[in-house]
Amino acid sequence: VGSELSCDEAYRGHLIENELASCTRRADVYERIRNCRIMVGTVAAISGKPELFRLKHFDVAIVDEATQILEPQLLGILCAGDRNAIDKFILIGDHKQLPAVVLQKAEQSAIYDETLLAIGLTNLKDSLFERLYRNCPAVHRSHDMLCRQGRMHPKVALFANRAFYGGHLIPVGLSHQTESSEHISRLAFYPSQPEKAGGSAKINYSEARIVAGLAAQIYESHRTDFDDSRTLGVITPYRSQIALIKKEIEALGIPALNRILVDTVERFQGSERDVIIYSCCINSYYQLKFVSNLTEENGVLIDRKLNVALTRARKQMFVTGVPKYLKSNPLYESLLNLIETQG
């Protein structure tokens, strides 16, 4: 369910409009939809097709990335209350990674209505997933965590696992997770120089050059199987730094590298690459506050942006930044210390 503009060409033939194009009678349309056991689409796309609920009953709805979806966005699906409603919802998400983007300040989206507060709805910026998760202890509902991860090599996952997940993450044991690390650096830090006073705080030429140099080395080591959509990605917090990194990479004269994704951590959530380079682009102490997204659980401080950035890589994770600024933050200091001893 969706638009051809946002659907990969390989799957456009399965879009509901294309599947129903050959139907000449309403009965044919009904039969085709009734016989379709699985429908896939974004929350917006499914909500925009209310006629589906008049034609078909759904036993289960699985909502992926549920922590990035606000409650009102789910209402159209949750409130289908007739006989053709959805029997059961499964919300899958990670509240320790980035939430939905809300432009309002927390004070503006805060809830003061006693009825809503009684059901745990304290702020409109929170997802239904978070509210239900927070309410579990109060209403004595059981909850658990999916611990097996098939993305990261254990050494790549080491910091995030210890700092944010209490050491509970267990590798599935896929081939890339069991590869030897004897001749490969899984986690490495490359110190950069801060920009001079008076310059833009949102660019760092030293880091851009480091990123380009690493990209060239990675391309050379993967020349025979380099895939711009799979092998390498670069994360950095500012658009200005993205443009600078792209310029430095373009100067290398390697066409394949010009097609790699260089973007913010928000745009990378849900994506993965074999190798990720993270350009922190912190040129002053105060910037650390703006590039973090902090939350706390059971007394443990969690930086959701840092967590996302460090969990995008399958095989290797490289970080570059100014050590003296990064070490002023306890989480970044712990990361650098771990890389120094384990990386």
Report residues per predicted region:
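Conserved helicase NTPase catalytic core signature
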Residues: V1-D59, Q73
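Conserved helicase motor core of SF1/SF2 NTP-dependent helicases
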Residues: Y30, A44-I46, E51-G343
